[in-house]
Structures are given as structure tokens and as C-alpha cells.
Amino acid sequence: MGGFFGAVAHQDVTLDIFFGVDYHSHLGTRRGGMLIHDQQDGFQRQIHSIENTPFRTKFEKDLTEFHGQSGIGCISDTDPQPLLVRSHLGLYAITTVGIINNAEQLIQKYFSDHGHQFMAMSSGKVNSTELAAALINQKDNLVDGILHAQKEIQGSLTLLILTEKGEIIAARDRVGRLPVLIGQKEGAHCVSFESFAYHKLGYIDAYELGPQEIVRITADGFETLSPAGKEMKICAFLWTYYGYPNSNYQGINVEVMRYRNGEIMARDEISRGALPKVDYVAGVPDSGLPHAIGFANRSGKPFARPFVKYTPTWPRSFMPANQEVRNQVAKMKQIPVPELIEGKKLLFVDDSIVRGTQLRETVEFLYESGAEEVHMRSACPPIMYSCKYLNFSRGNSDMDLLARRTVQELEGDEGQQHLEEYADGTSERGQCMLKTICEKFGFTSLGYQSLEGLLEAIGLDRDKVCTYCWNGKG
């Protein structure tokens, strides 16, 4: 997906940018970028591949080359960025998070007759950050340009711009799908995707942008340049999976939400009389663990770690672009604790079940290690739709998703007309899907969190949360 961090101060901000960006490394492993601005020497920039080397290690050698009182940086799973852009609006730097689904149409509509040459990428696609900048440059000022770009883009656009004056312009997506937060400390202000990133640097919470809000940030403060809109559709997956445990979005902590989510899952199973007799409740590392702790606390079953993830030399497994590599990384990281597996009845909670490839290997791994029973629970509902609003690593087709493939196997095209029923584990079709997946993977039982339970755990009004990947309503 990606994340960003920026800061403006009366003193040098190089280390703040370096560590602030590094604290977003859980959001991507393809590219990292840093850009610092000095009033005398102008912009300094470095972009590196971080596919095989972490951001911090890759950029440490560049730190002596950077100096300045303002800067932005990013972790990107797509484009090389931040970019430097020269236009009638002046020279500025830009970094973005989001996705542009109608890139070709926009190029044809606005740029085909104007001789605009876009930077070629190895994927053959246009750099979406460059396209966003080109749309911004069609207007007479940055604010109007940002609003124009967000209106034209099908998908989402959240961004930071660093101007020649050393000011940061921050803009949250039109419906606030991703967070943008401002921190402050003496003589400095920062802007970040993850709130904990600036807490570790001595900043305190100052402000959270509303949907479509545009804010100017300087060393001495911040001001709204364009007001927030009323509609919000923040991504629910920030709490269930992508967000780091220490972060807060809309005032709701990620780790606390995950505990609450697990508790609600257990509560609902108990009320249905569906809670199995198990020796332990366990979580699939990392983000499945707090959901499992909440489940264990409410169910009264002991929590344990039947396998432990070896992390010192393995990156987060969903990030490598190649699915085969991703699966191999996931497999190599899992180290069993035989004493907690052999002859045991285990209930595992995972943050989600997407394609199911790694899950199959996890179950095989547990049975090979001597587990007697493996009950699986997903901390979110069945994923029925690939995200079209953010650049998640979820595959190229809805049929890459385990739930959709299973529906297709059961009823063919007819089943696609009944996805809402299949997503409800208490319905006849939902029960049929659960049984089929259980048989396919060898689960003793399978359960998904309900959409109502998930929204209860988040605690926001349901019309403020994007649930597209579960029910097709964004």
C-alpha cells in the first residue's frame, strides 16, 4: 500500500524524516524515498529499492548528504517517489498514497493532444504520482489543482506536497479512506499516516484531517486551506490488518480494536452455542494475535503460541510481489512449539482469509506437527471483492479470493448473484461455503466475524466505514 511522513521545523529535520518514514515500513517493501529542502541549497532527494534491504539500512549512508528545515518521505509499494515537479505553480515535491483506476482515460482526456510525456516504469504503467501532479498542474494554484485531481481520479488520492518555501501541503482523500495526522513539538510540526511514528520523535497529537481537507503546515503551525467534506469512508482494514498496533485512526486505537473484535467473535459464538472445546486459542502472527487474545479472554480458553514467527531476517510476508516468494517466506518464518501442538485441539484466529494459499500451508504445518484438531476463525467477514480504492496486494481478479472461488465452484455464475447470503455464516448458502472450505483445507471448523460484529468493534458509525471488500459497498 504505502505511507508517508513530513516535517517542517526551525532546525534540521533530516533525522525526523528518516525515522518517521522508517516507521511506515510495515506498509510496503518495494521503494522508499526521502526529500529534504534547505532554503539556501534547495531540494535534495534519494529513492531506493527496499525489496531486499530495509529502509533504515538502505538510507543510513545518505544521511550525511541531507540537510534542511523541511522534508517529506515515503514507503511506496508502487511508484518511485517523492517526485520533483516543475510547472507554472513553481517547483515542488509530491508523494501520494492511493490508486488511479482510470489512468489511461485521464491521459487520453487531458494530455493526448498536449505532447505530455509521462515517465515510463518497468511495469509499463504510468507513474500514478506523476499523473496526479499533472492533473494538479492544470489549475492556477495547488489547492484547486488537488481538488481537481481528486475529483477526476477513480480510486483515491491522499498526498503531501513540499513547496519551494519549505511548506507542506497535506491533502486527505475525498472520503478519508486513509488517515492524515498532524503532530507538534517546540519549533516543529509534522504530518504522518501513522500517529505512533511521530510520538516516538517527541511530537504530540495536534490534529487529524477530515475527508478532502487540505492543510498548510509550517514550523509554527498549520491552517486549513480547503475545509473537510461531510462524507467519510475510512478503510476498515486499517484496524483489522494494515495499521500498526500503536496507531490511532479517528481516535480509535488499532490494538484495542483488535482485542474488542476478538471478544465480540467469542461472545457471538458462545451465544449461538457454537464454541468448540479446545485446549488453546492462538493467533496467526502478527496481526492475528490481538484478535486471538480478545477471543481467548472472552471465551475463557487459555491463549498460547503454538508456533512463533522468526522475524529477524524475514520481511512481512504479504509484501513480496511474487506470490510464490510470499508463500515461501511465510512458510520459512513459522517455527513450531511441538509441546503446544502435539495431540492438542487448537483454535486459530487470523486477521483475514484472502486467497487461502498461506492458510493451507499453515494447516498442513499444524497437522504435520501433531495437532489433533484445527479450528480456524477469521477476524473479518469473507472477502468477496478486490479493493478498488487502495493499492492493496490482493490479486488481479475477484476470483483470486478464496470466498469468491468457492462460490463459483458451488453455483457457478448463479452464485455470484447471492454473495450477501454466502457472506452470512448463519444462512444456508453461508453454511455450505464454510463446509466446502473446511473440507478443502482440512479445518475441523471454520468461522468468520460478521460485518455487524466488525463494525461494532471499530466503533464508528457504519456509514463512515468502507466495507467494499466484504459487501461491495464503498
Which residues does each predicted region cover?
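Flexible loop/turn segments at secondary-structure boundaries
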Residues: D12-T14, N102, I168, R177-L178, ...
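Short, glycine/charge-rich flexible loops or terminal/linker lids adjacent to PRPP-binding catalytic cores
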Residues: N297-K345, M384-N396
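A conserved beta-strand->alpha-helix junction
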Residues: S122-A133, F303-P315, L410-G415, S445-E456
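Active-site proximal loops enriched in glycine and acidic residues that flank catalytic Cys/His/Asp
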Residues: R172, F193, A219, A282-D286, ...
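Long, K/E/R/D-enriched contiguous segments that form extended
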Residues: S271, P276-P315
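Conserved short alpha-helical segments that host acidic/polar catalytic motifs at enzyme active sites
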Residues: M1-G210, R216-D279, V284, E373
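PRPP-dependent phosphoribosyltransferase catalytic core
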Residues: Q150, K165-E167, R172, G202-E208, ...
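Phosphate/diphosphate-binding loops
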Residues: A197, I204, L209-E213, R267-G273, ...
